[in-house]
């Protein structure tokens, strides 16, 4: 089978993003981590099988990774033509910590916004970037 053209075959839908309260760090400070939720829709006429996802987070203006989040999207069961997956939720293990209230952290002058690039791997093919999401500067409660 020819390699899957992921950007032409899979589409991110129902995308939402923000900063999730990851609780307290070992020093008792609030920790916020960037989080993206979405579904994938199969926009082809065929069933697609064996897809893995990797979200790569970066602070805007920086090259280095600021956390990754991997998920095995689906295997042999596949994703039928035109249908959508369950909701996936990718969050970085890295985030911001602060003594101040969480909403104050988002307004802090040192706060740098974060972007997540979503990469897709089909079977044994190379990872391909599917989309890029700027994380909304909002608090997520769940």
Regions found by a protein language model. Give the residues of each.
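A generic structural micro-feature
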Residues: 28-32, 47, 106-110
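Generic short beta-strand segments
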Residues: 15-20, 53-58, 91-95
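Short, solvent-exposed, Trp/other aromatic-anchored flexible loops in extracytoplasmic proteins
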Residues: 68-141
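Asparagine-centered strand-capping/turn motif at beta-strand->loop junctions
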Residues: 40-44
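Short structured motifs
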Residues: 16-25, 37-39, 69-75, 99-102
